[in-house]
Amino acid sequence: MELELRFFATFREVVGQKSIYWRVDDDATVGDVLRSLEAEYDGLAGRLIEDGEVKPHVNVLKNGREVVHLDGMATALDDGDAVSVFPPVAGG
């Protein structure tokens, strides 16, 4: 199946595009996608996953819903889903 992956801020700089289309197995989960991104892009290695979960302060959304409110890393994906990945944001 094919997903649209959307990147923001520093993650967009690493990937070099604001969105890409990514082919995954039909039974892929959010965790599978994040692991494959860390393997594909050196600048993302160690920045998405910590202790088997989405790293604290990183926001991952499936079709606009935060995956921490779904099934986390085990969130199932469907063909055509949009997965958005936001780096930690600080402000004042």
Curated annotation (Swiss-Prot):
Cross-link (Glycyl lysine isopeptide (Lys-Gly) (interchain with G-Cter in SAMP3)): K18, K55, K62
Subunit and interaction comment: Monomer.
Alphabetical UniProt keywords: Isopeptide bond, Nucleotide-binding, Phosphoprotein, Ubl conjugation, Ubl conjugation pathway
UniProt-recorded name of the protein: Small archaeal modifier protein 3
Sequence positions bearing Glycyl adenylate: G92
Keyword Nucleotide-binding on entry: yes
Induction trigger: Up-regulated by the addition of dimethyl sulfoxide to aerobically growing cells. These conditions also increase the levels of SAMP3 conjugates in cells.
Alphabetical list of CDD domains matching this protein: Ubl_SAMP1_like
Post-translational modification: The C-terminal glycine is likely acyl-adenylated (-COAMP) by UbaA.
Residue stretches spanning the membrane: none
Mutant lacking the gene: phenotype: Cells lacking this gene grow similarly to wild-type in the presence of either DMSO or oxygen as the terminal electron acceptor; thus, SAMP3 is not needed for DMSO respiration, suggesting that it is not required for molybdenum cofactor (MoCo) biosynthesis. tRNA thiolation is not affected.
Any one Gene Ontology molecular-function term assigned to this protein's record: nucleotide binding
Pfam families found in the cross-reference section: ThiS
DNA repair recorded as keyword: no
Covalent link Glycyl lysine isopeptide (Gly-Lys) (interchain with K-? in acceptor proteins), residues: G92
Function: Functions as a protein modifier covalently attached to lysine residues of substrate proteins. The protein modification process is termed sampylation and involves the formation of an isopeptide bond between the SAMP3 C-terminal glycine carboxylate and the epsilon-amino group of lysine residues on target proteins. Seems to be able to form polymeric chains with itself at Lys-18, Lys-55 and Lys-62, similar to ubiquitin and other ubiquitin-like proteins. SAMP3 appears not to serve as a proteolytic signal in the cell to target proteins for degradation by proteasomes.
